[in-house]
A protein has these predicted regions:
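A very general structural signal that marks isolated residues within well-ordered alpha-helical segments
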Residues: 32-35, 118, 157, 218
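Small/flexible residues
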Residues: 40, 51-53, 117-118, 149, ...
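General N-terminal targeting signals
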Residues: 30, 94-96, 152, 229, ...
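Conserved AdoMet/S-adenosylmethionine-binding subsite of the radical SAM
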Residues: 56-211, 223
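Auxiliary Fe-S-binding modules of radical SAM enzymes
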Residues: 1-17, 38-41, 167, 171-255
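N-terminal [4Fe-4S]-dependent radical SAM core
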Residues: 1-76, 84
Length: 255
């Protein structure tokens, strides 16, 4: 059963909380504000990351078991909304434990979204990449479109881009990319998202035959302006690919 308020996933799993600024998409980080307000946790490069409870860590096992018992389709898990899975300041063993959990929950498709593309590739070099782990990067502006190129080295069944908040027009090379999510920013200091920018991303996806998911417009509250684009709900999802488990060293060498 879906337990996440994020429209492109079924579940959200946070093995820890805490992060630090990485790029302009982080400027109005909702997670940092929520962590401080609700849990008294301060974020930053010199701040500790806080591991969540054992009960939280057991949730994916329960979700996986429920799917096995019901015989339903695989469900998506976003990991993590309150930090970054490839944050270098996270205790190394915690990340290893997450990947052990991924391998134990074969009925879950794990959406690993990061702003640390190079760190993701470095970690991928050390492991056999799970075939139920999707890899995604944030691409909020043209200066960070390079992240999309870096993750093409990882043999994930789905490689995706999160272009939310979309801060300017962006041109991306979508070969080797399987899914694009785009959207505007919400909250008190949201940055305006022009419709033309979204339509351009949608057009690039159509030309490349890449599924496009439009999440929301920019507004004070996330649902104030809805999520229709020209009267249409654009909620397309990707079909996972059967990619080889080894890292693409040619792509790595080119970065």
């Amino acid at each position: 059963m879906k337990n996440s308020g994020i429209s492109w996933t079924d579940h959200t799993f946070n093995p820890w909380m805490g992060c630090s600024w990485r790029s302009p998409a982080c400027d109005n980080c909702y997670a940092a504000t929520l962590a401080k307000r609700r849990y008294g946790i301060a974020w930053g490069p010199d701040k500790p990351r806080h591991r969540t409870s054992e009960a939280t860590w057991k949730q994916p096992l329960a979700w996986n078991r429920a799917i096995e018992e019901s015989g339903g389709p695989n469900e998506r898990v976003f990991c993590i909304s309150m930090g970054d899975i490839f944050d270098a300041e996270v205790e190394g063993g915690w990340r290893d434990e997450v990947f052990e959990l991924i391998n134990k929950t074969r009925r879950l498709n794990w959406l690993l979204l990061t702003k640390r593309a190079r760190e993701a590739v470095e970690y991928a070099k050390k492991i056999v990449w799970p075939d139920n782990a999707w890899i995604g990067v944030s691409v909020e502006d043209q200066a960070h479109a390079y992240r999309a190129e870096i993750i093409k080295a990882i043999p994930a069944p789905v490689r995706f881009l999160s272009m939310e908040p979309l801060l300017e027009p962006v041109k991306v090379k979508l070969d080797g990319i399987d899914w694009v999510i785009a959207g505007g920013e919400s909250g008190e200091n949201y940055r305006f998202l022009p419709k033309a920018w979204v339509l351009d991303i949608q057009s690039q996806c159509r030309e490349a035959n890449v599924p496009f998911f439009f999440k929301q417009w920019s507004s004070f509250t996330s649902d104030a302006l809805g999520h229709e684009l020209n009267g249409e709900v654009c909620h397309a999802f990707p079909t996972p690919k059967n990619r080889k488990a080894a890292l693409d060293t040619e792509v790595v060498a080119a970065k």
